[in-house]
Swiss-Prot record:
Protein name: Indole-3-glycerol phosphate synthase
HAMAP family associated with the record: IGPS_B
PANTHER family from the UniProt entry: INDOLE-3-GLYCEROL-PHOSPHATE SYNTHASE, TRYPTOPHAN BIOSYNTHESIS PROTEIN
Superkingdom assignment: Bacteria
Key words of the record: Amino-acid biosynthesis, Aromatic amino acid biosynthesis, Decarboxylase, Lyase, Tryptophan biosynthesis
Organism: Listeria monocytogenes serotype 4a (strain HCC23)
Pfam entry (one): IGPS
Length: 252
């Protein structure tokens, strides 16, 4: 089994046991898409709270998610991403709930979403943006979840890894498209993935490059075609995450 296949098998078990929550009031913050459209002079940052990963194992198990998120916000991050997968990334929906209560900016629920139950749970916990990963879904599931998320007044970050997936994301009208430099089957990372796919951008979406960023020089590689980068591990390993996050702000 690949990493992705293993994660999805476990996710199906997790979701089967997950209750269907009633939709509660949505947390108030700004639209991340509108924020990116209005702030184009600088590469914006999605800063991630991530305790562990399947490929790297434990990254920062002792992190205080709220303090980490507040450091990111103080550094000027446009959004906080919170891993909520409990098995492979050692996250939880409670991490997201606590972060959302304590920051003003949008919060992304970073998980392998395969059910509307997860969308409602994310919204109720304070997420205003959710991740849909094309390689984890059939096209029919993708469209269904995309429409369900929009009906819940959630923004959707649609994640792609190749030209075919990018074409699908653009076809369904995704406003936020993330190019993951990490192959979810092997977990190998290469920023060149984002460089290659940029030539195929053809919509009014905002584009985010995800994974593999450690320095401002890394970010500069994608600064002409992308609106933002998503950074997790590099910030989670830093003793001073606010300074580390500030160091990744690059002029476009």
């Amino acid at each position: 089994m690949t990493f992705l296949e293993e994660i999805l098998a476990q996710k199906a078990v997790e979701v089967a046991d997950m209750p269907l929550e009633k939709v509660a009031e949505k947390r108030k913050t700004y639209s991340f898409y509108e924020f990116l459209k209005a702030n184009t002079n600088t590469m914006q940052l999605i800063a991630e709270v991530k305790r562990a990963s399947p490929s790297k194992g434990e990254i920062n198990m002792g992190v205080n998610p709220v303090l980490q998120a507040k450091s990111y916000q103080a550094a000027g991050a446009g959004m906080i991403s919170v891993l909520t997968d409990p098995v492979f990334f050692k996250g939880s929906i409670e991490d997201l709930r606590e972060v959302a209560k304590n920051v003003e900016i949008p919060v992304l629920c970073k998980d392998f979403i395969i059910s509307e139950k997860q969308l409602i749970r994310a919204r109720n916990a304070g997420a205003t943006v959710v991740l849909l990963i094309i390689s984890a879904l059939t096209e029919e599931m993708l469209i269904t979840l995309f429409e369900q998320a929009l009906a819940l007044d959630l923004e959707v970050l649609v994640e792609v890894h190749d030209q075919k997936e990018l074409a699908v994301a653009q076809k369904i009208g995704a406003k936020l498209i993330g190019v993951n430099n990490r192959n979810l089957h092997t977990f190998e990372v290469d920023i060149a993935v984002s460089e290659r796919l940029a030539s195929d951008f053809s919509s009014d979406a905002c584009f985010i490059s995800e994974s593999g960023f450690r320095t401002a020089e890394d970010v500069a590689r994608v600064s002409q075609k992308y609106n933002a980068v998503l950074v997790g591990e590099a910030l989670m390993r830093e003793a001073t995450p606010e300074a580390a996050a500030k160091s990744l702000k690059v002029t476009r």
